[in-house]
Amino acid sequence: MPLPEKNNRVIITSALPYANGDLHIGHLLEHVQTDIWVRLLRANNITCHYVCASDAHGTPIMLRAKELDTEPEKMVEEFRSSHMKDLDSFNISHDNFYTTHSEENKYFSELIYTKAKESGYIES
């Protein structure tokens, strides 16, 4: 795959792991591969931002919280912290790592959507 042009800015992410359990080798493999790509771009002076989050949405979250007899939000934060600790131990260099319910995620999702719509990439 050719490198992006140096004047392009790139947003990179990995698949968001559910915040309902520990990371497994598949999660780690993907994050390591993505981190290698990020480091290659940065070594070539290409501006990129590596973002990810623990997925806090959906049935897997509700079922696991019920199984653990805890509030979903509390469980999500505990697994998010665990995910970050595991990824840090592999020197994964996320610029931002939130949850899908965080204020930061809401802000950036709305910002990206608004900019894309204003630029004509989204019609409604």
Residue ranges and their predicted role:
Residues 2-124:
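N-terminal, positively charged nucleic-acid-binding surface of large information/translation enzymes
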